[in-house]
Amino acid sequence: MTFEMLYSKIHRATITDANLNYIGSITIDEDLAKLAKLREGMKVEIVDVNNGERFSTYVILGKKRGEICVNGAAARKVAIGDVVIILAYASMNEDEINAHKPSIVLVDEKNEILEKG
């Protein structure tokens, strides 16, 4: 049996852009994404702290420092400046669960890394 478990999280990131006309995804600063163990194309769930919206999309690695941009139709669910939580889950069996520690990255309002746990 497997369970869906938290794999990684970027906590309280700030939306820097919302691009309705781009093919859907979330663009995340590559250094930040890698620290959070997020991969290009990986499914993530976005929770908007400001408005309560919750939606799924996939990761695109961004080149700009601190960039967090929601693209495509999901851009309607956020506003620039909103605070979001970016979550990734993984299916794990009991042994994997016991050995796993989620990657949790806390950031400030400029998406600069405060803490990695």
UniProtKB/Swiss-Prot annotation:
It is found in: Cytoplasm. Its main location: cytoplasm. Binds 1 pyruvoyl group covalently per subunit. It is an enzyme of class 4 (lyase). Its EC number is 4.1.1.11. The keyword Isomerase does not apply. One of its GO terms (biological process) is alanine biosynthetic process. Is synthesized initially as an inactive proenzyme, which is activated by self-cleavage at a specific serine bond to produce a beta-subunit with a hydroxyl group at its C-terminus and an alpha-subunit with a pyruvoyl group at its N-terminus. Keywords: Autocatalytic cleavage, Cytoplasm, Decarboxylase, Lyase, Pantothenate biosynthesis, Pyruvate, Schiff base, Zymogen. GO terms for molecular function: aspartate 1-decarboxylase activity. InterPro entries: Asp_de-COase-like_dom_sf, Asp_decarbox. Substrate binds at residues 57, 72-74. It comes from the Bacteria. One of its GO terms (cellular component) is cytosol. The active site is at 25 (schiff-base intermediate with substrate), 58 (proton donor). It catalyses: L-aspartate + H(+) = beta-alanine + CO2. Its cofactor is pyruvate. The modification Pyruvic acid (Ser) is found at residue 25. Catalyzes the pyruvoyl-dependent decarboxylation of aspartate to produce beta-alanine. Belongs to the PanD family. PANTHER family: ASPARTATE 1-DECARBOXYLASE. Heterooctamer of four alpha and four beta subunits. This is Aspartate 1-decarboxylase. It comes from Helicobacter pylori (strain ATCC 700392 / 26695) (Campylobacter pylori).
